[in-house]
Design a protein with these regions (language model features):
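Membrane-embedded alpha-helical bundles of multi-pass transporters/translocases
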Residues: 1-215
Length: 215
């Protein structure tokens, strides 16, 4: 039916000259992509490690960490991802034009913007963690004790919020310069440190210790 409609799909062919011309660019993109995924995914990998270790703790520990992380992800997603997404094309253009002064100014403004919004978010979550968790989850099988234990995990996680947001911003200059090695080195160090702190803090503070290690 597609042939009868005279629709030309030659542009999808690997023999298409346009595809061949883009082969080098595509290869470079894929080379840069893998480290970027690992560099940006360090937080999620740390969270996965937390969940695995939480499975060895009393029932409910995984849920406490998961719900606390969902709440903590809201300002992280809104601020960190939004700022980094807006910064990347601007910074890439400055790098392309070799405009170091404007590039540094853009980075500085983004960092200031991230701090201005993340610190109040941290304070708000710290002061209202119990109320936030109770409002969102205190119903059905989710008891008052569950709410308290989840709010403790949220309180621990929120202290890392400014750093989480700044990380999203600070990796942008490296990606704009096509340097994916530095972020991945930092990510590997971060994940190693998180694992060590997990093993130390889990004994005394249980699931809250895992949240502290992540922060």
């Amino acid at each position: 039916s597609l042939r009868r409609s005279s629709i030309d799909f030659k542009f999808l062919s690997f023999q298409n000259p346009a595809f061949k011309n883009r082969k080098k660019e595509t290869k470079n993109f894929l080379i840069l992509l893998a480290p970027a995924i690992i560099g940006n995914g360090a937080y999620q990998i740390n969270l996965l490690i937390d969940m695995i270790l939480a499975s060895t703790l009393p029932d409910g520990s995984i849920s406490y960490l998961y719900f606390a992380d969902r709440v903590n992800q809201l300002p992280l997603g809104v601020l960190g991802i939004a700022i980094s997404t807006a910064l990347l094309p601007i910074l890439s253009q400055h790098v392309k034009e070799r405009n170091v002064i404007e590039a540094n100014a853009s980075i500085s403004e983004s960092i200031k913007f991230g701090i201005y919004f993340s610190v109040p978010a941290l304070v708000g979550i710290f002061l209202l963690s119990n109320q936030i968790i109770s409002f969102l989850f205190l119903r059905g099988e989710f008891s008052l004790e569950d709410s308290k234990l989840t709010s403790l995990a949220l309180t621990a996680l929120c202290f890392g919020l400014p750093a989480f947001i700044l990380i999203k911003i600070l990796v942008v200059p490296f990606f704009a310069n096509e340097d994916t090695k530095t972020p991945i080195k930092v990510s590997v160090f971060s994940m190693s440190l998180n694992l060590i702190l997990n093993l130390i803090l889990i004994k005394e503070f249980l699931h809250v210790g895992l949240a502290i290690a992540t922060s």
